[in-house]
Amino acid sequence: KSPEALEEILWESFFADLHNDNIENILPENTQNKEFSQFYFQHINKLLLARSSKRYVTKANYNITRLHYLLKLNNSSKAIIMVRDPVSHINSIVRQDRIFSESHRKNPKTKHFMHMSGHYEFGLDKKLINIDVEKFTKIQKQFNTGNDIKAWAMYWSMVYNYAKSLIEQLPKSNVMLCRYEDLCNDPKNFFCQSILFFCPLFLVGLHI
């Protein structure tokens, strides 16, 4: 199970079009929203104080399209992008989408809860990240004609091509690409040799 920070509720409160799939959902570096930046850091500081912690970690898939903006807000931020073998990843996504869609059919309240918590990745009313309008239109066409597997494959390609561009554009001290399979095969070694030093968590006294 993956813990969710439920950060998306905050983002949606300050950016109205984050999940408008008719436009690109990317927040560029020149994004201006003083109210959000003030509230966001107040929120983080509140959590750190409440938990007597020094570092804040969030698991948020949508933030991949906000990294330029987030790094402008805090240039010491670290982003870890996980990439998984496309065949197994797409198979997993298709399975999850079917599970959530069936849940929404049986109990519409589950769909409402997902929307309230800022999750639109799966289910009957999914809203995917629009990174490129032309590509996204073709993806939607595949979904509309029932070609879900092809649609998800095209979506995977769009998202991870964008991730590749981020790795090339952003400082290596801020963004790291990690293979999901490496983490699964040897989690302790992977964490110690990669994530621990990249963040760097050893500075806050974390021991494994």
Where are these regions (language model features)?
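PAPS-dependent sulfation machinery
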Residues: 1-56
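Active-site glycine/GP-rich loop and adjacent strand/helix microenvironment
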Residues: 57-60, 86, 93, 149-156, ...
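Short catalytic-loop micro-motif centered on adjacent basic/acidic residues
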Residues: 55-59, 177-179
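Short alpha-helical
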Residues: 64-65, 88, 185
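PAPS-dependent sulfotransferases, especially Golgi type II membrane carbohydrate sulfotransferases
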Residues: 101-208
